[in-house]
Structures are given as structure tokens and as C-alpha cells.
């Protein structure tokens, strides 16, 4: 079957075409994201994704063979992606990964990256002068660990507190107005309570596998990324909770973006309660906090 026949036309013939089967296989691995499926000169969306995205992107919802669908031109994709990300959606970008002219049957496709409000440095969501922070939160009975990354600048910071007073946590977390927060799946209810109590429920909440916050796992990820044998040079040698938060955040970003994140070349540690995660001069100079 020729790759030049667009899926809209194929869907007229049969909703179980090889290309639709390919779409469904890929979508199965990205149930928590809207899938932008590249076909010819468009990104297509189908089924519930189309129903959800079409009103947000302000485009028409159509259907073929009872399959809801909508599409946007690939050259204008940033405009529509921006609308979705500003509303807190996660979007998986699926591209052709082989030359259509050389393909036998359906062209191979794969998700090349997943965009979220905290990771979409390719897009200017709310202006070029604002940093785009993503946070990672690790809660324990004995305290908490926090990590922050701005992918635009490569700045990465981590902190932890042994205080069991969770009221201290939101102040540290909201100093930089993160667009997204990553946390262990088992802590989802607690994190939602924290965000709700401070009117920050609109922040994209991204639960992550609990094992990603395991200290040994997180430590290995950080040492591998920074190419060091010890985290002592970053003052993280005995900061288990900060390491867990930071390592899990790097793991999450590498999984979504599928790149080396080479811009992130160090992590700075700040002791909560005695030293601000971001000092006042840094906040002012880098404009890390929105004017309310």
C-alpha cells in the first residue's frame, strides 16, 4: 500500500488498515499522552485524543468509518502544541523514521519525544523571558527531597529537609513556579493535597514509577550522567532524599526527550531552611518567578 495515501482516505475504506493498526500499537504505549501521529504533511489525532484535543486547538472534529479524527499541518504544529501544553496536556510526537519512498508497506514510525509543560523548551509557551522549571518531589516520613531543572538554561538544583513539617515544603517548591511536578506514584494523593491547599492544582502532575526514586537507582543515574564516581563533589554524598529526587527527575527527562541532556552538566545543592534553593539575586536575574 502506497505511503502517499493519507490516513484520512484510508480510513474511508477500512478502520482496520495496517496503518491504523500501527497507530493503535504506538498509542498503547502512550496512554497518558495525546498522540501526534505524523502522516504526509499533517499530524493526525484519533479516537478520544481527537475529541479531547480538537476543542483545545480550536479545530474541527471529523470522522471516517466512525473514527473521530482531527489534524493540523506539520509546519504549524508549534502553534497547536502550545495550546495543548498551556492547558497542561502531555503530547507524544510520532514521526516517520524511514524514507517513505523506500518503505515496503506501511512506513515505520516511532515516538521521538514526549512534550510536557515542564520539558517543552522548543516552544515559547508564555514568553521568552521566563524559565521553564520542572520539579521532582520525594516524600518520606523523615522529611523530603526536592529537585528542580530548567531545561532552557540547564540549571539543576536539589535540596532536602529532615523536617517532618510538610507546611515548609510548598514554600520551597513554589518559589520557582514549576509548570510540572514529578513524584512517586504512591504519593499521588499526598501531592495533590499539597498542591490543592496552595491553589496550584493546575500544575501538571506526573506520577513516576516508585522504583525510579530508589536511592541506588537515582545515584547511578546521576553518576552516569555527570560521569563521576561519587556525588561528593556536588555535596550530595550524604543527601539521600535529594539524590532520590534528582536522579528520578533525570530519568524522567531522558525517557521523555530521548536525548543526552548534555546542557545539564552539574547539580547544585542547597540545604533547606538555612540556604534558599534559589537565592534572591538568581531569581531576579533569571526572572524565575512570575509576576503575580
Residue ranges and their predicted role:
Residues 2-292:
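Charged catalytic and DNA/RNA-contacting regions of genome-maintenance
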Amino acid at each position: 500500500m502506497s505511503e502517499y495515501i493519507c490516513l484520512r482516505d484510508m480510513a474511508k475504506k477500512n478502520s482496520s488498515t495496517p496503518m491504523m493498526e500501527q497507530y493503535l500499537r504506538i498509542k498503547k504505549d502512550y496512554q497518558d499522552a495525546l498522540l501526534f501521529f505524523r502522516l504526509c504533511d499533517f499530524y493526525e489525532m484519533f479516537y478520544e485524543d481527537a475529541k479531547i484535543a480538537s476543542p483545545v486547538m480550536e479545530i474541527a472534529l471529523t470522522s471516517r468509518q466512525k473514527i473521530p479524527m482531527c489534524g493540523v499541518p506539520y509546519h504549524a504544529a508549534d502553534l497547536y502544541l502550545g495550546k495543548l501544553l498551556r492547558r497542561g496536556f502531555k503530547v507524544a510526537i510520532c514521526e516517520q523514521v524511514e524514507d517513505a519512498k523506500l518503505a515496503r508497506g506501511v512506513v515505520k514510525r516511532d515516538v521521538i519525544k514526549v512534550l510536557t509543560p515542564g520539558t517543552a523548551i522548543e516552544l515559547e509557551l508564555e514568553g521568552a523571558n521566563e524559565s521553564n522549571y520542572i520539579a521532582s518531589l520525594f516524600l518520606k516520613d523523615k522529611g523530603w527531597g526536592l529537585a528542580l531543572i530548567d531545561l532552557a538554561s540547564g540549571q539543576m538544583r536539589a535540596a532536602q529537609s529532615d523536617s517532618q513539617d510538610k507546611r515548609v515544603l510548598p514554600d520551597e517548591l513554589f518559589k520557582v513556579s514549576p509548570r510540572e511536578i514529578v513524584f512517586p506514584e504512591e504519593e499521588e494523593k499526598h501531592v495533590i493535597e499539597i498542591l490543592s491547599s496552595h491553589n496550584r492544582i493546575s500544575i501538571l502532575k506526573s506520577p513516576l514509577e516508585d522504583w525510579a526514586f530508589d536511592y541506588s537507582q537515582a545515584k547511578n543515574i546521576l553518576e552516569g550522567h555527570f560521569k563521576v564516581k561519587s556525588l561528593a563533589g556536588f555535596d550530595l554524598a550524604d543527601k539521600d532524599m535529594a539524590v532520590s529526587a534528582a536522579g528520578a527527575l533525570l530519568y524522567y527527562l531522558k525517557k521523555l526527550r530521548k536525548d543526552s541532556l548534555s546542557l545539564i552538566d552539574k547539580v547544585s545543592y542547597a540545604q533547606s531552611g538555612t540556604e534558599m534553593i534559589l537565592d534572591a539575586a538568581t531569581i531576579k536575574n533569571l526572572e524565575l518567578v512570575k509576576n503575580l
